[in-house]
A protein has these predicted regions:
Chain B
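Iron-sulfur-associated redox domains of electron-transfer enzymes in respiratory
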Residues: 1-166
Length: 290, 166, 666, 198
C-alpha cells in the first residue's frame, strides 16, 4: 500500500477543521498510510503570492524540501495550498533565477531541494490511486435521495491540475455518485466564489458567493459539496450577510469527504458535520442519515 | 573584452528535408549562429562516415548531420541506413576522444525551419563551451614529438658509437 | 588522397560570380570583399559581382565571360539552388559550357537572411565560396537523362477541386482517373445550400460539373475507392487503388431506388452521415438525389443480411436489374499515370474539443456544417430552421473562430469562417426571421465582393459583436434569460461584458487537415507543413507543386481555402500536369550512381541497400551493376561501398572531400 | 465637469511597457489579439474600471498611471479562468500579480483595497509563527483598515466560535529559526540586487 504525506495548511487547522477531520477519517477507513508533514509552515497562499512572490516560493519551498527527505507524494487538500505548491514546483523547474534565489535561501536555513516531490489533491489520489472500485465496496449506507451540487471552485483544476477537465471536472461527481448521492448538472462548477475577496472587498465577494448558492438552489440541490476550505468558509459563513443583502438561501455546504465518510458509515461526529454554520442535519436526514 | 572562441561546424544536410528547412529558415528570416557551413547531399544516406572523420581531421570543431524524420525519407529508407551507420560512428568517435555532442545527428523536416535555428544555436553553444578540437594542431604536435623521439634515439646511437670508438 | 591529385593537375579556369540580390544579400554580406577574395583563389580566372545575377544581363555576362575567358567551370554565389540552379545551368550552356560544370553557393537563405553580424556572415560567404570553387574542379561533363512521360493522369479526391482538375485535364484530351473515398463525388460543396458572396445555390453550379465528370469519355470515375500504393517516379507512376464493396454492381444499378423503398426497415432509422446525423437513412441508401454516380450502396454496419445473413433481401428482389451482390469483395486495381493531382480536401474542427460551448450538452448548439444542411432546401428539414426540439429559434448566436486562432486548438485563421458565418447569418435570418448575433474577433472579408457582402449583412440588421465568447450555458441571471442559452462575451468595442440569451448557437468551426493526411503524404512521398496541411514546393512561386515532381496539390488539402480559390488552384494544378505531359518527356537529374567495374570487389554490400532494387549482381562477372533508369540518386550505395567503386554523379567522393576541405581551409 | 479623453504619446511610458513584457509571466503580452475572452470569463470584470483586455492593451502601450491606478488589478481573485481560456497563452493572472507588486512599490494602490495590508500582516505573522491564524489575521486586518466593518463581522465571529472553527491562539512551528534564516536570506539577496543596480 502506497504511503503519503499530508499537508494540512493553515485553514484545515482553523476554519476548515471539518475538512481535516473528515479527510483523515476517510483515509483511515480506506486503510491509507498517511502522515502529517513534519513541522510544515504556511504555504504562502495566493494573497501573499500576489505581492511577495519569491517569499511565498520560499515558504512553499521549505515544505517541499522537508517532504523530499521522505520521498513520498504530498497530499494538499486546500486548493490554495495545492495551487501554490504546484506553482512553486513549476517555477523552480522552469525559472533559473527563482530557482537560484529560493535554493540559496533554503541552503541558508540548512535545507536542500532537488525538485522531486509530487503534490497531489485528495480527489486525484482517491480516484487514481485508491480507485472507485475499492471505494464503492466500502459504501455501507449510500446517501440515497441526497441531491448535491458539486462545486470545485477555481484553483483546483486551474491552471495546474492534470487529473481532471478544466472546463467540466467530474472526479468529485464520480465519488459522490459512488456514495449514492445524486449530482445536479450546473455550469458554475468551477466559477470563482470570490472567497479571496470577501475579507477585503465584501460587496464583491458576497455577490459572487450569492450567485453560486442561488444557482445551486435553483438546480434543486439540497447542499453544495466542495473540496476547498476557503470556498466552504465563504459559501457557508456569509449566508447571514447574503440573506440581509439579497435573499436567504439556507444552503448547507459540505466537504466531499464528509459525504463520503457518512456513506462509508462513519459517525457524523468524526466528520465535523456539526461544524457547518448552516446546519446540514435536515438535508442529511432527508438522505436517510443521522 | 577577450575574443570568444567561435567553433567551426560542418553540416551535411539532405536536399529534401533539412536543406529545405534551412531555406525556409532563411525565407522566414529566423536568426541563428553563423558557425555552421552547410554541405548539400541528396540524402543523409549519402554521408560516408569518412566524410565526418575527414571534417574533424581538417579542423572542424563539430559535425552536424541533418536528414528527414524516420519514415519520411524522400528515398524511402535512406535515413534508417544513416542512423545505423552513425550509431557505429558515434561509438568510434568516442573511442577517439571526440564526443560530448561534437558530432550530432538530427531529423529536421522541410517544414521545421525553427528547428534548424534551435539545433544550430544549441550545438554552437555546446561546442563553444567545449573549446577547440583542433585535430590538425594535435597531428602536428604528434608528428613533432615523434620526430624529437627519433632524433633522441638517433642521438643515443651516435653516443654509443662514440663510446665504442673510444 | 584527393588534395594531392588536385595539386598535380593544372587547375581548370573558374569563373566566380556573386549576386547582391538587390540589398537582400548585400545588406548583410560585404559582396565586394567576397568577390576580391575569390579572385585571389587558385584557378579563379574571373571574379565578378552584380546586382541581380539571375537577370538577363547577369546571365548574359556569364555566357559572354565563358566564351571570352575560356572558362571551364562556373560558380555562382546567390540564393538557394532550389530557386535558381537551373537558371545558371542554362547560362553556362548558353556560353557553351556543360551545365554540370557549375556549382551554386547559397549565401542568401543560408547566410544573409539568417545572420545579424555582417563580419561573420561575410566570413561564412567566403568559406562557402572557397568550398564551391574547390569542389567544382572535380565536376564532370554530364547529360540529363530523358524519359518518356505517360500521358494519363490520376486525380485523388472528388471535391470541387478534384472535379475541376479532372474536367480541365479531360477536356485537354488526357485520360483521367478520378478516385474518391466516399460513395459520391461533390465533397463538402455538395452539402452547402448557397455559396458566398453571390448566394448562388451550390447544387446549381456543382451538379452540372458532377454529371459532366460521370459522362466524360476521358474520365474514369472510381468512387468508394482509395489509393493504397504509389510506386515509380515523375512521368511514370504505378498506382494501386482499392475499391470498397458497395454490394451493388455499379454498372447494373440505374439509381431507381426501388430497393430503398423495399428494404425490410420500413422507416429510415440510421444516422445519415451526409446530413450530419440530422436525418436518418436505411441500410441501403444513396447519399443525396444528385449523388454521382447515382448508384445505391449497402452499409455493412446496419444491413441485416450482411450482419447476420438472415434477411429476406426484398431489396435484391425489388431490383429488376439484379444489381445486388452481397458477396461482393473489395478489389484492387492498378494503373499507370504520368502525373498525379492530390485534392483530398479538409476536415472541420471537432467541437468536442471545446466543451465550454456546450455542443452535445445543449441540443440548441449546432456546428456550421449541420446548419448548412438545416438551411438547405434539399436538407432533412427542407430548409426550414427547426431546432432539435421542434421549436423555431427567435434569437441565434454565431460564434466565429471555433478551433481557429487559438494556441490550444489550431493557431491558424481558417480563412473561410468569417464569410460562411455571414452567409449562414443571412440564410438563418431569411429562413426564420430570428435575431442573429455574430461574435467575431476580426472580420476577414478580403475577397472580391466580400467586403460588399459584409456591408449587405450590416444593412440587414444582423448584430456584430467583436469578442470571443467565453462559454455557452443554461445559467440564467435575469427573467429573459430563463430557458435560453446564454452567451457570455466582452463587447470589446463597447468595453464591457455582455450576456446574450439565444435559442440557437452556431459554432463556426475551423478547417483542419484530413485525419489521415500524414499517411497520405507518405504514400505519395510529399511533405506536410507543421500544421499538417500538404507542403507546397514554394509558398509563392510553386504553390501547387510539391517536392516530388509530377505530384501536384489543389484545394484545402494545402491550406484552408474557399471555393473560388480552390477552383483557381485546381486549374493551376491541371495546367502544371499538362505542361509536364505535353512536353512528352522529362529530364532527370543526372545525379545517379554507377559502378566502376574494375574497382568493384563483388562484395554485394550495395545490392540489398537500394530501395529501388536498381542494383543487381552479375554472377558471371562477379560484379554489381546499377540500372540508371531505376536509380533515383540517393547515393546510399556510394556511401556504403567498401572499395569506393560506386560513384554518384555530382556527389562523388572527390567533390565532397574537396568541399569539406574548402569550408575549413583558412 | 467634462474630462478630456485624448491621450498623447507623451502620456505613455514605453519603459513601463518594456518592463511588463520582460517580467516572468509577461512574455506573451505583446501577442494579445484583444479577443476579450479574459474579460468574458472573469467573474470580477463587472466590477472593474478597465476590463482585463483593456488593461492588457494599456499595459503594452505603456499607460502606466492608468494601469497601476486601476481597481482591476486589486479585484483579481486569482481564479485563473482567463489564463486557461486565453488563445495566446498570456498569463493574465501573473500579469495582475506583477502589476500589484509594482503598484505597491510605487505606493499608488487605491486605499480602499487593503490587500497590501493583508499581505504585510500575513508576512509578519508567518515570520513570527510560521503559520497563519485566520482569526487573528482577519481581526488585525479590519482593525487596521476599517474597524467598523469589523463590527459587522462579529456575527460571523460568534458563529465560528459556536462551531469551534475559530481559535485565538496562534499555531506555531517548531523550527522558526530555520524559517527566519530562509526569509532573511531572501531579503539579503534582494538588498544586494538593489545595491548592485543603484
Amino acid at each position: 500500500m502506497k504511503k503519503y504525506l499530508y499537508f494540512p495548511g493553515c485553514s484545515l487547522k482553523g476554519s476548515g477543521k471539518a475538512y481535516e477531520e473528515s479527510f483523515l477519517a476517510v483515509c483511515k477507513a480506506l486503510g491509507m498510510d498517511i502522515r502529517e508533514l513534519e513541522d510544515w509552515n504556511c504555504c504562502g497562499a495566493t494573497a501573499y503570492m500576489s505581492v511577495e512572490e519569491t517569499k511565498s516560493y520560499a515558504l512553499a519551498g521549505r515544505n517541499l524540501a522537508i517532504a523530499e527527505r521522505e520521498d513520498l507524494d504530498v497530499i494538499a487538500p486546500c486548493s490554495a495550498c495545492y495551487l501554490v505548491l504546484n506553482k512553486t514546483q513549476k517555477a523552480l523547474k522552469e525559472n533559473t533565477e527563482i530557482r537560484r534565489k529560493v535554493v540559496n535561501a533554503l541552503k541558508a536555513g540548512g535545507l536542500d531541494y532537488k525538485g522531486t516531490v509530487k503534490v497531489r489533491h485528495p480527489l486525484d489520489v482517491l480516484i487514481n490511486d485508491v480507485g472507485l472500485e475499492k471505494i464503492s465496496k466500502l459504501i455501507k449506507n449510500p446517501v440515497k435521495g441526497l441531491k448535491l451540487a458539486p462545486y470545485y471552485g477555481c484553483q483546483i483544476v486551474r491552471p495546474y491540475a492534470t487529473f481532471d477537465d478544466q472546463h467540466d471536472p467530474v472526479t468529485m461527481d464520480k465519488l459522490m455518485k459512488a456514495a449514492g448521492a445524486e449530482c445536479v448538472t450546473w455550469p458554475l462548477k468551477t466559477r470563482c466564489c470570490g472567497g479571496s475577496l470577501t475579507g477585503t472587498v465584501p460587496e464583491v465577494g458576497l455577490r459572487l458567493a450569492y450567485i453560486i448558492l442561488k444557482e445551486a438552489k435553483k438546480r434543486g440541490a439540497g447542499a453544495i459539496v466542495t473540496l476547498c476550505p476557503l470556498c466552504q468558509f465563504n459559501l457557508d459563513g456569509y449566508q447571514g450577510k447574503i440573506a440581509s443583502k439579497y435573499e436567504s438561501v439556507d444552503m448547507p455546504v459540505l466537504y466531499f469527504t464528509q459525504v463520503l465518510g457518512l456513506a462509508m458509515g462513519l459517525p457524523g461526529s468524526e466528520l465535523g458535520i456539526k461544524r457547518g454554520i448552516i446546519s446540514a442535519e435536515a438535508v442529511l436526514a432527508g438522505g436517510g442519515l443521522r | 573584452m577577450s575574443e570568444q572562441f567561435e567553433p567551426k561546424i560542418v553540416a551535411f544536410f539532405c536536399n529534401w528535408c533539412t536543406y529545405t528547412a534551412a531555406d525556409l529558415a532563411g525565407v522566414s528570416r529566423l536568426k541563428y549562429a553563423p558557425n555552421a557551413r552547410v554541405i548539400r547531399v541528396m540524402c543523409s544516406g549519402r554521408v560516408d562516415p569518412q566524410f565526418v572523420l575527414d571534417a574533424f581531421a581538417k579542423g572542424a570543431d563539430g559535425v552536424l548531420l541533418g536528414g528527414c524524420h524516420p519514415g519520411d525519407c524522400h528515398y524511402a529508407e535512406g535515413n534508417y541506413k544513416t542512423l545505423r551507420r552513425m550509431r557505429m560512428l558515434t561509438r568510434m568517435l568516442k573511442d577517439m576522444g571526440i564526443y560530448d555532442g561534437r558530432f550530432r545527428l538530427e531529423w529536421i523536416s522541410g517544414a521545421e525551419g525553427d528547428k534548424v535555428k534551435s539545433v544550430i544555436n544549441d550545438m554552437t553553444k555546446k561546442v563553444r563551451a567545449l573549446g577547440p578540437l583542433d585535430l590538425p594542431g594535435k597531428f602536428k604536435n604528434w608528428d613533432k614529438e615523434i620526430e624529437e623521439l627519433e632524433a633522441q634515439v638517433n642521438k643515443g646511437d651516435k653516443d654509443k658509437e662514440a663510446v665504442h670508438a673510444g | 588522397m584527393t588534395e594531392n591529385k588536385s595539386k598535380k593537375e593544372t587547375l581548370p579556369r573558374v569563373g566566380f560570380y556573386i549576386c547582391h540580390c538587390g540589398s537582400n544579400i548585400a545588406s548583410m554580406i560585404d559582396v565586394l570583399e567576397v568577390q576580391k577574395y575569390a579572385a585571389a583563389l587558385p584557378g579563379v580566372a574571373v571574379s565578378r559581382e552584380y546586382k541581380y545575377m539571375c537577370s538577363d544581363p547577369g546571365q548574359e555576362m556569364i555566357a559572354k565571360d565563358i566564351k571570352e575567358h575560356k572558362l571551364e567551370r562556373l560558380v555562382v554565389a546567390a540564393c538557394s539552388p532550389n530557386l535558381h540552379e537551373e537558371t545558371f545551368r542554362k547560362a553556362a550552356a548558353k556560353g557553351g559550357l556543360n551545365p554540370f560544370f557549375f556549382q551554386m553557393v547559397n549565401i542568401r537563405e543560408h547566410a544573409a537572411w539568417v545572420h545579424e553580424d555582417k563580419k561573420s556572415a561575410t566570413e561564412k560567404a567566403k568559406d562557402l565560396a572557397r568550398a564551391a570553387i574547390a569542389r567544382v574542379r572535380f565536376h564532370k561533363s554530364l547529360d540529363k537523362k530523358r524519359v518518356a512521360v505517360d500521358p494519363n493522369v490520376l486525380v485523388v479526391g472528388g471535391g470541387i477541386a478534384g472535379i475541376h482538375a479532372a474536367l480541365t485535364l479531360a477536356n485537354a484530351g488526357k485520360k483521367v482517373t478520378l478516385v474518391e473515398r466516399e460513395a459520391t463525388i461533390g465533397g463538402h460543396m455538395a452539402a452547402f445550400d448557397k455559396t458566398f458572396p453571390t448566394l448562388d445555390c451550390a447544387a446549381c453550379i456543382l451538379t452540372p460539373k458532377m454529371s459532366a465528370v460521370k459522362s466524360h469519355p476521358n474520365i474514369t470515375l472510381w468512387t468508394y475507392s482509395e489509393v493504397s500504393k504509389v510506386e515509380g517516379y515523375v512521368g511514370n507512376y504505378k498506382v494501386t487503388v482499392t475499391r470498397k464493396p458497395r454490394f451493388v454492381k455499379e454498372d447494373l444499378c440505374v439509381g431507381c431506388m426501388e430497393c430503398i423503398d423495399a428494404c425490410v426497415f420500413k422507416e429510415p432509422k440510421f444516422k445519415d452521415k451526409f446530413n450530419q446525423g440530422l436525418g436518418k437513412r436505411k441500410p441501403v441508401y444513396i447519399d443525396f438525389p444528385q449523388a454521382t454516380p447515382k448508384v445505391v450502396l449497402v452499409d455493412p454496419e446496419t444491413c441485416i443480411q450482411l450482419k447476420t445473413g438472415k434477411c429476406k433481401q426484398p431489396c435484391a428482389a425489388a431490383c429488376d436489374r439484379k444489381a445486388f451482390d452481397f458477396n461482393q469483395k473489395a478489389e484492387t486495381k492498378e494503373l499507370q499515370v504520368g502525373a498525379i493531382v492530390l485534392s483530398t480536401g479538409f476536415k472541420t474542427y471537432d467541437v468536442a474539443r471545446s466543451p465550454q460551448y456546450g455542443y452535445g450538452r445543449y441540443p440548441g448548439v449546432y456546428t456550421a456544417l449541420e446548419v448548412e444542411r438545416l438551411v438547405n432546401a434539399s436538407g432533412p428539414t427542407s430548409g426550414e430552421v427547426v431546432l432539435r426540439d421542434g421549436t423555431h429559434p427567435k434569437a441565434v448566436g454565431i460564434i466565429h473562430c471555433v478551433g481557429s486562432r487559438d494556441a490550444k486548438t489550431n493557431k491558424w485563421c481558417s480563412r473561410v469562417c468569417c464569410m460562411y458565418s455571414l452567409k449562414l447569418a443571412h440564410l438563418i435570418k431569411e429562413h426564420s426571421g430570428a435575431e442573429v448575433y455574430n461574435f467575431y474577433i476580426d472580420m476577414r472579408a478580403p475577397g472580391k465582393a466580400y467586403e460588399e457582402f459584409y456591408d449587405k449583412l450590416l444593412g440587414e440588421g444582423v448584430h456584430f459583436i467583436r469578442g470571443r465568447v467565453d462559454e455557452v450555458t443554461d445559467w440564467a441571471m435575469t427573467p429573459e434569460e430563463e430557458g435560453k442559452l446564454v452567451l457570455r462575451v466582452e463587447d470589446t468595442l463597447a468595453g464591457f461584458v455582455r450576456r446574450i440569451p439565444v435559442d440557437m448557437v452556431v459554432l463556426s468551426t475551423g478547417l483542419e487537415p484530413q485525419p489521415d493526411a500524414q499517411e497520405v503524404r507518405r504514400r505519395f512521398n510529399i511533405g506536410c507543413g507543421s500544421e499538417g496541411f500538404f507542403q507546397e514546393r514554394h509558398p509563392k512561386l510553386a504553390p501547387v507543386n510539391t517536392f516530388t515532381d509530377g505530384i501536384y496539390i489543389a484545394g484545402a488539402c494545402q491550406a484552408p481555402r474557399d471555393i473560388p480559390d480552390t477552383v483557381a488552384q485546381a486549374g493551376a494544378a491541371a495546367a502544371e500536369a499538362l505542361s509536364l505531359i505535353d512536353a512528352g518527356f522529362v529530364e532527370l537529374e543526372p545525379n545517379t550512381s554507377h559502378i566502376v567495374e574494375e574497382e568493384c570487389s563483388g562484395c554485394k554490400t550495395c545490392v540489398p541497400l537500394c530501395p529501388y532494387s536498381a542494383i543487381t549482381f552479375d554472377e558471371a562477372k562477379k560484379k554489381a551493376t546499377i540500372n540508371e533508369v531505376l536509380c533515383k540518386g540517393c547515393g546510399v550505395c556510394a556511401a556504403a561501398c567498401p572499395s569506393g567503386s560506386i560513384r554518384q554523379n555530382l556527389f562523388e567522393d572527390d567533390e565532397i572531400f574537396s568541399e569539406i576541405e574548402g569550408v575549413l581551409a583558412k | 465637469m467634462l474630462e478630456q479623453k485624448v491621450k498623447y504619446e507623451g502620456d505613455c511610458d514605453k519603459e513601463f511597457a518594456k518592463w511588463v513584457t520582460s517580467q516572468t509571466g509577461g512574455e506573451n503580452l505583446r501577442h494579445c489579439i484583444q479577443c476579450g475572452i479574459c474579460s468574458a470569463t472573469c467573474p470580477l470584470s463587472l466590477y472593474m474600471d478597465y476590463t482585463p483586455r483593456r488593461l492588457i492593451n494599456m499595459a503594452r502601450e505603456g499607460f502606466k498611471k492608468e494601469v497601476l491606478g486601476s481597481f482591476t488589478i486589486w479585484l483579481c481573485a486569482s481564479c485563473y479562468a482567463c489564463r486557461v481560456e486565453c488563445p495566446k497563452e498570456i498569463q493574465v493572472t501573473d500579469i495582475m500579480y506583477l502589476l500589484k507588486r509594482r503598484a505597491i512599490e510605487e505606493g499608488v494602490y487605491p486605499r480602499r483595497f487593503p490587500i497590501p495590508v493583508l499581505a504585510r500582516e500575513f508576512g509578519r505573522m508567518i515570520f513570527m509563527f510560521g503559520r497563519v491564524n485566520e482569526t487573528l489575521l482577519v481581526i488585525d486586518l479590519f482593525l487596521r483598515t476599517n474597524w467598523f466593518k469589523f463590527l459587522g463581522m462579529t456575527g460571523l465571529g460568534m458563529n465560528l466560535m459556536r462551531t469551534g472553527r475559530m481559535s485565538l491562539i496562534p499555531e506555531t512551528i517548531k523550527n522558526r529559526a530555520e524559517l527566519r534564516k530562509v526569509l532573511d536570506a531572501l531579503d539579503a539577496d534582494e538588498k544586494s540586487k538593489r545595491e548592485a543596480v543603484s
